[in-house]
């Protein structure tokens, strides 16, 4: 590729270059000096070397500041060093996907990145133009899907890369996306889409294994064809596999593993025991390597997943049983060992353990163990004389055993693929399909064998197809831009393909020929190969080997060792093995080994060339790919240690060469690799020809003039781009750097002059200041000397005065101390004499007190003893009286119990009377009389109870009086005892009995308190009984009132019928019965009829037949329906900001008493009418109109309806009937502002339906607004390209951005103004306007923020200024709309505001992570901040993003965040919820009074609603009726 670049001889000191390095592939360097043919450069490691210019590549100085480009074609210098560095920079920032034109490069991150692959991310890429969002495997998948739909042509996606590069995961992601966009909305686990997805883990279990480089390496090639119908839905699928590595079944090396399915089966628990399996270490086919477990993978769980995948794909339980029986048989077969037999060159089973495993294998295969042993130890040869049995030595028997194991596993794998294809099913009517190819990449190891030869042959084929496609894309680009491209050529690899596959002397043909001869060896094969291709440029013979050969592939030279070529190419099938297993009693085993034709059984061996078969499969694959439009995904493994964030440059560079990425770059370099839009070219290189910038606004003409002035000829001008040959952009950058250097020198010269002048002025001013300061210091020093002398004299005077005063004060204080001591001694003596005198007096007083107190206590104890004897006597007397009172209280409780039972009986009878009141009015009147009699009897009993209670109270009063008398007597006795001093001898006896009397007294007091408590309880129960009796009396009165109300209502109805004109009555009576209405209408008559007692309307009911009455009801119902339908269909407008339709409908329902009906017909008509009205007309006008009306009607129902109960319903109806007679308006329709209406279940159900209708209307308005807003927001996220005349004025870095918003933001403002005007014209409550505007701004925030994170061209400084100016306009709009309508809309823009604020802030590199998270972007998550920081680039001032230390800290936090189970996507989710409930609407919308609103004029045309209009006449009529 380097030969395609011209020698860049114009390098000069200071230029940035790339230097080849043996450890890092390429390393950054700076040119220090240039000599004749050498350049002196200094690398980034500090090493200084001399290098030839042709071995250097230019390096873009902006690469260090930017975080790489998402498309390699945008690189300033397109070469392998730039490609490698760009991938490394992006990989360090977790940007694992990069484009090279239409080719996607995917670098394996070796860690989970769930935020890149969730459903929300799929929705973002669905339908997005290619290249508009960040590179992603979903973007390639979407391009293929859209191309298939738009062009009606099949597509293919080719995924390649070396083992461990992530091909399998990438393929699964592609299939996952295709099933997402092409799947059906179904929950069926057996859908085609689900089966296609589940085929991946199933094939991984049987076709993937751990290798040295990869823990989940695919050991086969896979091509999945996903078929689509005409609607773009998946209709079928087919899987083709290539070159399964059969030898891995019997032979593995450490640290590799066998296929995953074996380890899963050993860890399956009960199933493993059933098949006599144990630890994998016990089986020869698994213990050849010491690796049995994979880190972070549970074989038991994977076994369950495999079983689940089998169920979804459609493999029955019997077939699953057969699959795992076969796997277990293979493991047991591997443990069968052989030893030499008695005969020469014969073999037998080695030991009993081998015999056991042989028997287990035979049991699992369901065949005879002896026949199985014979097929392993002998071989049958068919000759003319007959069949000859040949014994095999132990080595040959082991080979036969391994051949059987490989054959069984290969048949099992083929059956599994075929079963998946049959289960998923292929659509024969499918017009197009998308094929996903997951095949091994180019391999070059230290030792390369037959597998590497086949793999590299396949990659040569695919590379040829890839080169043709890339060259075709280049041609399409040139043709689209209308430039000349006919002379561009590219290198083809057809010669190496001919060397490999051409007949009759290609490598494959010679290999097959050698395999057909038993005595051929790899030496003879190599010799014949060199004899035929001695002078071929693509074939070389190594110096130190006679049998190896080297092929020059497109990715480099590979040396193959031919020792095992012949054995691996021979695919022998032993007929005895096939015959044995085809006759198995196990249907599954016999099914995977169909019976062979008779002619094929004549030989014990059937030879088949692996290379020839692979060549045919590859040819069929290429034919399929040639019929499709290809898309390429190149997977790259960044390091050999499988660790994240480690990038091995040499390994990646080798993979880029092997994957054809650098070949695509080379093809691009052969033409015009550098392409720039005219506007970008003029913006960057316009300073090279400033004299042309103001002449014309034609950017193409300006580009041509700039290139002509510089004398460049290797360019072509397309329609929208300028195309430059390789190296030309370097010349332009060099010239630009020279101009910038000259300008910089001029600026520096002027700046130095200015700085020197400023320094001189500053120095002169400083000198003057210093002189003035020195003079001031001298003057201040002289003044300070004089002031100090005067101060010293003053200090001396004050010191002398202070010393004299101190001596005088000391003398005075000494005299005072002497005087005070003398006075204190005399005072203390006097005080001691007074203290002794007082103590003597106090002792005398206490002695006298003690003497008198002892006498008093003796006398007092005697008195108390006498009192206790007397109280004992009185207490006994009182106890006898209290016992009598207690007996009387027991009788009272018995009477109370009987009374309670009678009350309960009364309550039961009252309930019975309520239930039976509907049987007839006569029965009710008789029951009322009975109840009155019962009430009188209960009243008498109540009076008796009251008298008993009064008597008991009187008795209690008498007892209290007696207690008072006894207390008085006690006091008298106490007075008498004061004079009984002579009774001292009886004190001892009284003291002994005092304690017992006190105890008895306490017992009696407790019994007295209990008696009082019982009396109080009895009184309380009597009061409750009285209350119940009053309630019964009230209910009886209500029944009487109801009866009178019903009679009054019947009279009113009678008078109404009498008012009817005689002509009308005659007309009704004269109609025939045949004119009755349909029964369906009769069913609805109960909607508006109020049931009336039949005995009051019998005279008139006899005059009208039942059919006539039903017809009148049906006609009235039809009229009601017509009125409601007209109110719904016509736009009635608003009256005083109140919706007329809602008020009229509510008043009609109230007047017709529809809320009390058991029918839902009228409510269904209203709901259906509203839904029909929403479907027709202009949605912008209809939806707000009905949002206003439906919410108003809902509020009226919410505030005035309440649920009905059984006991209150009758009372409420009778109350309304009576009130209707008294009030004229109530007769024809209750007042809207009246108390709550008792609603039945249909009315409550109607309220719920209306609530759902309001939510539906709100959701439709919101969704329509989002649909209108989405295309406007798509153009607002990125600043538009300014015209040349305007842009020329602000091209300098110091240019001030325009503050006025562009037309795109003006369209947003117009949209918001239109929204507000529509809502306010239809008088939508401010509550709904506030919610709608808030959700609209939330959607603006979501759309702008997600677009910012997915499009790198939007994360620029100038674009941030542009979006910020637009957001400021939105802020003005919110301020003008006021909080009543805007609500918290400004806070909904927090995410985009903070993101844009981060883009436009200066000196990002000085910001710490805490400052960014806490001050700049407190709302954003660490993942979102990391995404913006890594995608940001300054297109205006060229400043850098945050520092690398901050990026590293962010990466650590993002990795920790990845380990959480919660959603960790950096994109925002759209909130589709309804942000209110019926209660919120009721609280937010002001009170609405429908009675104050005059209905429309057409309402008077309907007789059923005339009462709503003609209120005065109705009032007068009601007065006459009364």
UniProtKB/Swiss-Prot annotation:
Stretches assigned to the IQ domain: 763-792, 788-817, 811-840, 836-865, 859-888
This protein's UniProt keywords: Actin-binding, ATP-binding, Calmodulin-binding, Coiled coil, Cytoplasm, Membrane, Motor protein, Myosin, Nucleotide-binding, Nucleus, Repeat
Domain called Myosin motor: residue spans: 67-737
Residue ranges that the Swiss-Prot or TrEMBL entry lists as coiled coil: 889-1059
Free-text function comment from the UniProt entry: Myosin heavy chain that is required for the cell cycle-regulated transport of various organelles and proteins for their segregation. Functions by binding with its tail domain to receptor proteins on organelles and exerting force with its N-terminal motor domain against actin filaments, thereby transporting its cargo along polarized actin cables. Involved in trafficking of Golgi stacks and mitochondria. Plays a role in nuclear shape determination. Drives nuclear movement along actin filaments.
Comment field on protein domains: IQ domain mediates interaction with calmodulin. The tail domain is a globular cargo-binding domain.
Record protein name field: Myosin-15
Originating gene: XI-I
């Amino acid at each position: 590729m380097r030969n395609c670049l011209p020698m860049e001889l114009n390098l000069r000191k200071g230029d940035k270059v790339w230097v080849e390095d043996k450890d890092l592939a390429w390393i950054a360097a700076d040119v220090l000096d240039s000599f004749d043919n050498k350049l002196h450069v200094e690398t980034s490691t500090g090493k200084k070397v001399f290098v030839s210019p042709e071995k250097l590549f230019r390096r873009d100085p902006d690469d260090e500041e930017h975080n790489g480009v998402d498309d390699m074609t945008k690189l300033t210098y397109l070469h392998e060093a730039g490609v490698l560095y760009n991938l490394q920079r992006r990989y360090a920032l977790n940007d694992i996907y990069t484009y090279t034109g239409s080719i996607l490069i995917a670098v394996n991150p070796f860690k989970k990145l769930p935020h890149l692959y969730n459903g929300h991310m799929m929705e973002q890429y669905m339908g997005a133009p290619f290249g508009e969002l960040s590179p992603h495997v979903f973007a390639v998948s979407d391009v293929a899907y859209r191309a298939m739909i738009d062009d009606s042509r099949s597509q293919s996606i080719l995924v390649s890369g070396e083992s461990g590069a992530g091909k399998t995961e990438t393929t699964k992601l592609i299939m996952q996306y295709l099933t997402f966009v092409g799947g059906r909305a179904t929950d069926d686990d057996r859908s085609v889409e689900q089966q296609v997805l589940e085929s991946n883990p199933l094939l991984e279990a049987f076709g993937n294994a751990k290798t040295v480089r990869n823990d989940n390496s695919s050991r086969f090639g896979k091509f999945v064809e996903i078929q689509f119908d005409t609607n773009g839905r998946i209709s079928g699928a087919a899987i083709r596999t290539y070159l399964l590595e059969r030898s891995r079944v019997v032979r593995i090396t450490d640290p590799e593993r066998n296929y995953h399915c074996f380890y899963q089966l050993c860890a399956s628990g009960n199933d493993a025991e059933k098949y006599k399996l144990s630890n994998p270490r016990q089986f020869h086919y698994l213990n050849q390597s010491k690796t049995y477990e994979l880190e972070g993978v549970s074989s038991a769980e994977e076994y369950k997943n495999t079983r689940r995948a089998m169920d979804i794909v459609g493999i029955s339980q019997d077939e699953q049983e057969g699959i795992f029986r076969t796997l277990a048989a293979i493991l047991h077969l591997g443990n069968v060992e052989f030893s030499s037999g008695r005969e020469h060159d014969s073999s037998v089973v080695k030991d009993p353990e081998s015999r056991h495993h042989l028997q287990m294998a035979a049991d699992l295969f369901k065949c005879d163990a002896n026949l199985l042993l014979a097929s392993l130890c002998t071989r049958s040869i068919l000759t003319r004389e007959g069949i000859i049995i040949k014994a095999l030595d132990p080595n040959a028997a082991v080979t036969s055993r391994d051949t059987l194991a490989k054959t069984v596993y290969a048949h099992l794998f083929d059956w599994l693929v075929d079963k998946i294809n049959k289960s998923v099913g292929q659509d024969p009517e499918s017009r197009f399909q998308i094929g996903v190819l997951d095949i091994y990449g180019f391999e070059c190891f230290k030792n390369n064998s037959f597998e590497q030869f086949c793999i590299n042959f396949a990659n040569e084929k695919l590379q040829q197809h890839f080169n043709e496609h890339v060259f075709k894309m280049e041609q399409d680009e040139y043709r689209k831009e209308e430039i000349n491209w006919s002379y561009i050529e590219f290198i083809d690899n057809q010669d190496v393909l001919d060397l490999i596959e051409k007949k009759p002397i290609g490598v494959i043909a010679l290999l097959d020929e050698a395999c057909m001869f038993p005595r051929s060896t790899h030496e003879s094969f190599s010799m014949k190969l060199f004899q035929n291709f001695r002078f071929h440029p693509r074939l070389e013979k190594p110096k130190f080997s006679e049998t190896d050969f080297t092929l020059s592939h497109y990715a480099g030279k590979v040396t193959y060792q031919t020792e095992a070529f012949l054995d691996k190419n021979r695919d022998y099938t032993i007929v005895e093995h096939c015959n044995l297993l085809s006759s198995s009693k196990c249907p599954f085993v016999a099914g995977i080994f169909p019976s062979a034709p008779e002619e094929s059984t004549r030989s014990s061996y059937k030879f088949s060339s692996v290379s020839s078969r692979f060549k045919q499969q590859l040819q069929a694959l290429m034919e399929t790919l040639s019929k499709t439009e290809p898309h390429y995904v190149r997977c790259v493994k960044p390091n050999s240690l499988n660790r994240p964030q480690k990038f091995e440059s040499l390994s990646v560079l080798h993979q880029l060469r092997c994957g054809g990425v650098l070949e695509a770059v080379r093809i691009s370099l052969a033409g015009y690799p550098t392409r720039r839009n005219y506007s970008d070219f003029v913006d960057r290189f316009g300073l090279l020809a400033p004299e042309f910038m103001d002449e014309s606004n034609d950017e193409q003409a300006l580009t041509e003039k700039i290139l002509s002035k510089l004398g460049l000829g290797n360019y072509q001008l397309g329609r929208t781009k300028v195309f430059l040959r390789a190296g030309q952009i370097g010349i332009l950058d060099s010239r630009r750097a020279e101009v910038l250097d000259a300008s910089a020198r001029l600026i520096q010269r002027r700046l130095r002059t200015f700085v020197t002048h400023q320094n001189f002025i500053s120095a002169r001013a400083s000198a003057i200041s210093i002189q003035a300061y020195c003079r001031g210091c001298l003057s201040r020093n002289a003044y300070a000397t004089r002031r100090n002398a005067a101060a010293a004299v003053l200090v001396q005077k004050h010191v002398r005065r202070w010393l004299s005063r101190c001596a005088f004060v000391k003398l005075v204080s000494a005299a005072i101390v002497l005087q005070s001591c003398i006075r204190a001694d005399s005072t203390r003596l006097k005080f001691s004499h007074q203290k002794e005198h007082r103590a003597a007096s106090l002792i005398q007083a206490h002695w006298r007190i003690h003497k008198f107190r002892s006498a008093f206590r003796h006398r007092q104890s005697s008195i108390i003893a006498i009192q206790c004897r007397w109280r004992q006597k009185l207490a006994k007397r009182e106890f006898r009286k209290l016992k009598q009172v207690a007996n009387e209280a027991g009788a009272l409780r018995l009477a109370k119990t009987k009374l309670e039972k009678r009350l309960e009986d009364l309550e039961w009878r009252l309930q019975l009377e309520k239930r039976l009141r509907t049987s007839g009015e006569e029965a009710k009147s008789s029951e009322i009389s009975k109840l009155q009699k019962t009430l009188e009897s209960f009243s008498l009993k109540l009076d008796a109870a009251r008298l008993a209670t009064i008597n008991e109270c009187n008795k209690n009063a008498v007892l209290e009086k007696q207690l008072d008398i006894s207390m008085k007597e006690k006091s008298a006795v106490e007075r008498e005892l004061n004079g009984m001093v002579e009774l001292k001898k009886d004190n001892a006896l009284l003291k002994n009995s005092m304690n017992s009397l006190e105890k008895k007294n306490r017992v009696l007091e407790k019994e007295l308190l209990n008696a009082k408590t019982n009396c109080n309880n009895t009184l309380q129960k009597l009061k409750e009984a009285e209350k119940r009796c009053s309630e019964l009396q009230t209910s009886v009165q209500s029944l009487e009132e109801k009866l009178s109300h019903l009679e009054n209502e019947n009279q009113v109805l009678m008078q109404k019928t009498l008012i009817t004109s005689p002509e009308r009555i005659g007309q009704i009576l004269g109609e025939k019965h045949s004119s009755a209405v349909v029964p369906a209408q009769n069913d609805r008559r109960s909607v508006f009829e109020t049931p009336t007692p039949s005995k009051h309307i019998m005279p008139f009911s006899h005059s009208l037949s039942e059919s006539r009455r039903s017809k009148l009801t049906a006609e009235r119902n039809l009229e009601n329906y017509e009125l409601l339908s007209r109110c719904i269909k016509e736009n009635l407008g608003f009256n005083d900001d109140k919706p007329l339709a809602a008020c009229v409908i509510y008043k009609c329902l109230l007047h017709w008493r529809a809320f009390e009906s058991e029918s839902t017909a009228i409510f269904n008509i209203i709901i259906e009418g509203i839904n029909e009205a929403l479907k027709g007309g202009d949605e912008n006008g209809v939806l707000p109109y009905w949002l206003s009306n439906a919410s108003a009607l809902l509020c009226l129902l919410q505030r005035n309806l309440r649920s009905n109960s059984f006991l209150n319903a009758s009372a409420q109806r009778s109350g309304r009937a009576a009130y209707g007679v008294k009030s004229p308006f109530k007769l024809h329709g209750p007042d809207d502002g009246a108390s709550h209406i008792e609603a039945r279940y249909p009315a409550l159900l109607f309220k719920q339906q209306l609530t759902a209708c309001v939510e539906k209307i709100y959701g439709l308005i919101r969704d329509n607004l989002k649909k209108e807003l989405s295309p406007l927001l798509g153009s607002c996220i990125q600043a538009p390209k300014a015209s040349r005349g305007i842009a020329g004025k602000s091209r300098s870095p110091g240019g001030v951005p325009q503050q006025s918003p562009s037309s795109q933001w003006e369209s947003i403002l117009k949209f918001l103004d239109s929204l507000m005007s529509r809502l306010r014209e239809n008088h939508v409550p401010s509550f709904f306007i506030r919610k709608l505007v808030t959700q609209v701004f939330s959607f603006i925030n979501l759309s702008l923020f997600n677009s910012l994170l997915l499009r790198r061209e939007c994360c620029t400084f100038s674009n941030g200024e542009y979006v910020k100016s637009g957001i400021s306009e939105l802020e003005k709009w919110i301020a003008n709309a006021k909080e009543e309508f805007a609500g918290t809309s400004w806070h909904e823009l927090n995410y985009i505001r903070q993101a844009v604020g981060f883009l436009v802030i200066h000196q990002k590199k000085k910001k710490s992570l805490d400052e960014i998270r806490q001050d700049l972007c407190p709302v954003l998550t660490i993942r979102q901040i990391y995404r913006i920081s890594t995608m940001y680039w300054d297109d205006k001032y060229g400043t850098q993003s945050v520092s690398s230390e901050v990026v590293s800290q962010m990466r650590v936090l993002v990795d920790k965040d990845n380990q959480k189970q919660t959603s960790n996507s950096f994109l925002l989710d759209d909130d589709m919820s309804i942000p209110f409930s019926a209660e919120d609407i009721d609280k937010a919308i002001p009170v609405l009074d429908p009675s104050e609103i005059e209905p429309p004029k057409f309402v008077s045309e309907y007789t059923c609603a005339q009462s709503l209009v003609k209120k005065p006449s109705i009032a007068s009529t009601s007065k006459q009726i009364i």
